[in-house]
């Protein structure tokens, strides 16, 4: 497999050189451009005009800006639009948006004509640092999130931190969950930088925000390159906090709780579980929680979507997670800040429930 990092370009403004960048990857200038309703309104005219000036032929597709767009019915509709406009395997697909557009577009690209190239142009912090990188693309099923999909590496990931300036604070803090995750699982120095310059990063100040985005993106790319299909357990460490998070998202019926918010809560649960099982020292537990305490949530969200939840119901919801094997939940844990591992033994249910309860109590005290 080619280096995942070699496909990542971090540049402002990135769209002005898209033709040149496509040429470096051997991509043609016939592009289906997939937006959601928000990204089409914010960036669509500028992106399409720039591409056409650079000699591109484009077909635009637009989907609603919500998680429910990641569905078989939406994909089927988009396939039809592509067929009707004579899109063949000589085309590529450019995804302009956050995780929903990136996942949906990647899924369509992986399956259309048995696979056409996909280029990711992420516009959210979460997509820039996580979902656009690594080639995992999927749609949802009523019984679980991201259950139907492919591994389909993007030909390019074009990251422009300037897009972040249009985002509300809730989106920034949601994206910071994945940024902080990389410090927890792989880079103690990065964790320390985030702790020291949290305000500058979350205010999108330079050079801090570009540094945080770049380090996150290239950390994920490095992990993906070493374990593309999750055979060694290394790539699974990218799911730190996610087993809990997917249960939270399912209980919220994939509404009113952003993925990054669920991951933030999930990381607190995972810290407590790492400590309860004897892997993480108390001092590092507290250090990790201190950084999580700096996240901001909408009023009453944590109480409604986590603190008030029944432990048993959340535990049951977690079993829809893709990381379980033979109905056994698998957890990514820390043995120190900066190093994670996939715990390949069954964790007693009582310990999982205690960790959730500890996190509920901690969040309750912090609110």
Curated annotation (Swiss-Prot):
Cofactor, how bound (note): Binds 1 divalent metal cation per subunit. Can use either Co(2+) or Zn(2+).
Pathway of action: Metabolic intermediate biosynthesis; chorismate biosynthesis; chorismate from D-erythrose 4-phosphate and phosphoenolpyruvate: step 2/7
UniProt key word Lyase: yes
Record Gene3D superfamilies: 3.40.50.1970, Dehydroquinate synthase-like - alpha domain
UniProt subcellular location: Cytoplasm
Keyword terms of this UniProt record: Amino-acid biosynthesis, Aromatic amino acid biosynthesis, Cobalt, Cytoplasm, Lyase, Metal-binding, NAD, Nucleotide-binding, Zinc
Reactions mediated catalytically: 7-phospho-2-dehydro-3-deoxy-D-arabino-heptonate = 3-dehydroquinate + phosphate
InterPro entries (UniProt xref): Dehydroquinate_synthase, DHQ_synth_AroB, DHQ_synth_fam, DHQS/DOIS_N, DHQS_C
Enzyme Commission number, as recorded: 4.2.3.4
Binding site for NAD(+): 99-103, 123-124, 136, 145, 163-166
Signal sequence annotation: none
Gene Ontology annotations of biological process type: amino acid biosynthetic process; aromatic amino acid family biosynthetic process; chorismate biosynthetic process
Binding residues for Zn(2+): 178, 242, 259
Disulfide bonds listed in the record: none
Needed cofactors: Co(2+); Zn(2+); NAD(+)
UniProt xrefs under CDD domains: DHQS
GO cellular component term of the entry, any: cytoplasm
Its biological purpose: Catalyzes the conversion of 3-deoxy-D-arabino-heptulosonate 7-phosphate (DAHP) to dehydroquinate (DHQ).
Family per record: Belongs to the sugar phosphate cyclases superfamily. Dehydroquinate synthase family.
Descriptive protein name: 3-dehydroquinate synthase
Top-level taxonomy: Bacteria, Pseudomonadati, Chlorobiota, Chlorobiia, Chlorobiales
Gene: aroB
